[in-house]
A protein has these predicted regions:
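Single conserved hydrophobic/aromatic residue that forms the stacking wall/gate
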Residues: 276-292
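N-terminally biased helix-coil "hinge/interface" segments that flank
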Residues: 1-275, 284
Length: 292
């Protein structure tokens, strides 16, 4: 038995699916409670399990999808972050959309980075970084670090991240962890967006895992990515940007599986938008650099 949970901007839905019989056993819906996600998640889980009349031990896998990340970015409700930009002039990164991604949040620009061959272009001033981090620590919840050509040599990103973690204990996104592509300014923007989402998606995952554990469900929790594939909860805690369009992707994959059709047009309608998709092309979206 499979349990699917989708936390959207308005409702949290749950479904029990019997894979062996290819049958939907029960569905349930509960309002998404943004002030405390546990209320909506628990409500949906309790309702669907009551309707399905099953034991918690019968659930073998839990699949979680959500539009919380998408909505947070669209509505500008991501958490406050700081960007650490190494080896780039500010105007270069600005052209990639840094101002739009950061808003009023701070950015630290440092000399450093590497050349295309992986050799250091300039030394990295870690003492200055430490001073800057201390000055802005109270204003942010996470950091995003991007260094020039870090995909060829991540040394400066790793060193900067170590300083930030030691001083703050807060989450740090490294751009070379998100992509192997060379466009550093766009990697910087993607790293910023990822950092904005960390606490949001981490909160959802932790809430869901706790709700399941309280009800005796010991099945692994997997999360739907924006391309429809499943990844571990630990993975999306560090890379929540991978859940962009998670909800619509789950709708598309689910519709294709339930109907068994090779070609179909699927409509995904919610409070904020309507999406039309073709079943032979699973949703593929990334902020530039999620495409390897």
């Amino acid at each position: 038995m499979l349990l699917g949970i989708d936390t959207g901007g308005t409702y949290t839905d749950a479904v029990l699916y019997d894979e062996a019989a290819r049958t939907v056993v029960a569905t349930a819906k509960s309002p998404t409670t943004h002030h405390d996600l546990a209320i909506g998640v628990c409500g949906a889980i309790d309702a669907v399990m009551a309707m399905g009349v099953i034991e918690p031990s019968a659930i073998e896998l839990v699949s979680l999808s959500t539009t919380l990340a998408t909505n947070a970015l669209v509505e500008g409700k991501g958490r406050p972050v700081a960007a650490v930009i190494i080896g780039f002039d500010s105007d270069v990164v600005e052209r990639a959309g840094l101002s739009e991604a950061l808003g009023n949040d701070p950015a630290i620009f440092l000399h450093g980075g590497h050349d295309p061959h992986g050799s250091a272009a300039a030394p990295l001033d870690l003492a200055r970084l430490a001073d800057e981090v201390r000055a802005i620590d109270s204003r942010v919840e996470a950091f995003a670090v991007t260094a020039q050509f870090s995909v060829r040599n991540p040394e400066h990103e790793l060193a900067a991240a170590e300083v930030v973690r030691e001083l703050t204990g807060k989450p740090v996104t490294l751009s070379h962890h998100l992509s192997a592509r060379l466009n550093g300014p766009k990697r910087a923007v993607t790293a910023i967006l990822n950092s904005r989402l960390i606490s949001i998606i981490d909160g959802l995952v932790r809430t869901t895992e706790a709700a399941l554990a309280d009800r005796g469900v010991n099945a692994p929790v997997m999360v739907v990515r924006g391309d429809g594939s499943l990844v571990s909860a630990a993975f999306v805690r560090e890379r929540p940007i991978e859940t962009i369009l998670s909800g619509p992707a789950a709708s598309l994959v689910g519709a294709a599986h339930l109907t068994g059709l090779d070609d179909a047009i699927i409509s995904d309608i919610d409070r904020k938008s309507t999406r039309l998709n073709s079943s032979h092309q699973i949703i593929s979206y990334a902020v530039f650099c999620l495409k390897k």
